[in-house]
Amino acid sequence: MDKITVEVIKSSTSYIAEEMGIILRNTAYSPNIKDRLDFSCAILSSNGELIAQAEHIPVHLGSMAIGVKNTVDYLKKESIEIEKDDVIIVNDPYIAGTHLNDITLLKPIFYNDEIIGYVANKAHHVDVGGYAPGSISSNVKELYHEGLIIPPSKLVINGKLNKELLNLITSNVRVPKSTIGDLKAQIASLNIGVERILKLIEKYGDREVTEAWNKSLDYSEEYLKSKIRDINCICEAVDYLEYKDKLININMKIEIKNGKIKVDFTGTHRQLDAPLNAVYGVTVASTSFALKAVIDPDLPMNHGIFRVLNIIAPEETIVNPKKPAPVSVGNVETSQRIVDVIFKALYHEFPDRVPAASNGSMNNVIIGGRGWAFYETIGGGFGGRNGKDGVDGVHANMTNTLNTPIEVIENEYPIMILEYSLREDSGGAGKYRGGLGIRRVYKMLSDCMLSIIADRIKISPWGVNNGYSGACGEHYVIKDGKKIPLSGKDTLYLSCGDIVEINTPGGGGYGSPYERDINLILEDVKDEKISIKSAYRDYKVKIIKKDDDFVVDMEETKKLRGL
């Protein structure tokens, strides 16, 4: 097969995954999916290997490569035959590869009575039952506390919705209308995916399409090998998660040698009776994302890269726990720390490619009451990079979602937003400043339960190359005028009128702040990104307010900087 045809089929397949995402977004019910875009779509081979994916959520996509293959293997093991118009549903993290809120749907692509591949999507449902509204809480001790566990089962049988299974699911969740609407949107997305793949086959032929898919895997394998062929290194690092009064270590050693990459998590903290555990699928997703980001962001992401990558994640650790350890937080927080520790290790080999640490948390806010549940993640600062400041107020690394529009929150939930702003002085000082964190303030308009799942409250996002650390996160509840600090992982009841203040971490700085352009510092002060005090203390630049403007006192600044 000629290379042009292979490329056309490969690109067409990727776009089909993108179109699946468009359909899912446009037909979804919940704000978390239709507004925040907390979902992912992919196309896989007949044995469950990842062929193509849309540019959606990294933690979903990397784990989909594990989860779909596990599901296909489960169906074979249990002698469950999947027919042409069936749709499989699964959310068991130890099969599907993330956490219970992420419900995966899978549909076979039949051609000439044979399965030639699968279309799949994964979407974060705002509630799947369990201990707390939103199904994510730091208080849980085992998986059963986190919600309804669905093994691979037929949600659609011969084209008809399995109402018995759907009734079972909706009887165990707090917002059944949302669950039904989002599941139907996922089904519609799969139907479009199958339809488009069959049209591709009609145009090029089934053998040609599957051959092009296989060649795309070969290409990714060879592409990655070509990028590391001349690299021979061993890099090590450790970073930490915060849980109560403990620091939970993630140890990691990377060896790049002879066109292969080995990532070894030996020495990482043992699994916890707390939800910080990350199932193997999350570890794979985080590892592959971090390596791609550093080695070559243009690396085509499919199963071919796993032929080059060997991940050693010891069992019964927080990066490969044993069921029924709880895992809801591992998906959203431990995933971020895995990326950080890999970046930290690779900085020594790739100093020009690795940024300072980003905010390092998805900053999860889950609020719910009788008959409703609200979930969002809040962005923070991106780390400063060689040649560029970190981006302010963005979702970094393992998440790729949008913020929830204030108008949507106030229309859909008994919540009022009092403030949504950037945190002055939260970005780490550096030649290239870290991005700023976010302040978001909520007022409760009814009694409810709040869960905060965040990190980098004690250990700040690190800077590199003499850059300073970004600011830690700070979270508060204001009750009866009293401002009460929260830890990064809290679940508590709130009363109508209570106020919740979330301050997300900033990104670390890159390079010495004394090398930062003075004019950029002046602009930062004018834009209220850094204060006059920070300019003086961290950058050795004296700025004074003159009338309604700010100016640099160059004489004093030269003294401060030794110029």
From Swiss-Prot:
The GO terms describing molecular function are: hydrolase activity
Q: Which family does it belong to?
A: Belongs to the HyuB family.
PANTHER family (alphabetical): 5-OXOPROLINASE RELATED, HYPOTHETICAL 5-OXOPROLINASE (EUROFUNG)-RELATED
Kindly provide the name given to this protein in its UniProt entry.
Uncharacterized protein MJ0963
Q: Which organism is it from?
A: Methanocaldococcus jannaschii (strain ATCC 43067 / DSM 2661 / JAL-1 / JCM 10045 / NBRC 100440)
